[in-house]
């Protein structure tokens, strides 16, 4: 990264529901957007454990790190811009993992003039309850990571309807850490 130029950290997340099936659409979308994202998080790549992808999922200008799934759906991937240095945080991947219920992938991006940034992509399968996710996984994870005094960017599909006020148990958990949940349209609605 050229430290003399102004740099904005710009993440993007997409639930792609099979990267093999939608890889061309992803590349077309990135071409249309014509933006240089710092990190692109992809959930539901459907990369299976013990079965390497059968296609080249490289995107020019990015390095990839991923966590496969042992389910028919799921799996997460981070594309990190080649303009950034980073290192995988597999120790954090393990904290947010439950067989066929939850997958995550994390990387840490070091900066010379500000705190490092931990960026992760999380996929919570619909079968895991919101309470189990927040109490058993998200809350302990956030408590641990907040002690590192680094910026945190969490991307992903938590399968929580943020418009349903009965499911907002995670919002008070995020607020003290200055994390803000965002809601955007799903690819299913855009197809």
Task: List each model region and its residues.
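A shared catalytic/ligand-binding motif for oxyanion handling
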Residues: 1-191
